Amino acid sequence: GQIITKHTSWDRFAEDIGFVFLTKPFLRAILSHVSEKDMTTIAVTVCRGAMKDATIYMYGELTVDTFIKSLDSWLAASHIPFRHIKDGDTDRYVIQHELGNVFSQYLVTVINAILNEFKFRIHKQELTDQSVSFEIDKV
């Protein structure tokens, strides 16, 4: 059942919305040549729009809830181990990407850029070169 759910929630739409699959070693090698400043610019100008478009395409609307669902689907389909802990109104994430500090910064930047549009934000963030953890709360 879970494999079928994953397929319908992300893989089914990935090609339609312009996402491609890359191996971790390839992505890690590319990211090692990208500055944090450049990655932040890319995250806000390009990737923010792509994630918003993906969410609208998959769920028909962009809300905090549909964005969080598409984030979960994207992480799962990308085989990036993560935990999403729902605690009342707070969503807590622990993401073990193993793709370097630049990717940690990328994740937090793109997620925060979208959340800010809804008066939500990331806080209590901890970034390492292997993982990122944060909470999502209303501002």
Q: Model-flagged regions — what are they?
A:
Residues 1-86:
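N-terminal accessory segment detector
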Residues 127-139:
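Beta-rich nucleic-acid/ligand-interaction surfaces
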Residues 73-130:
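Short, hydrophobic/π-rich interface segment
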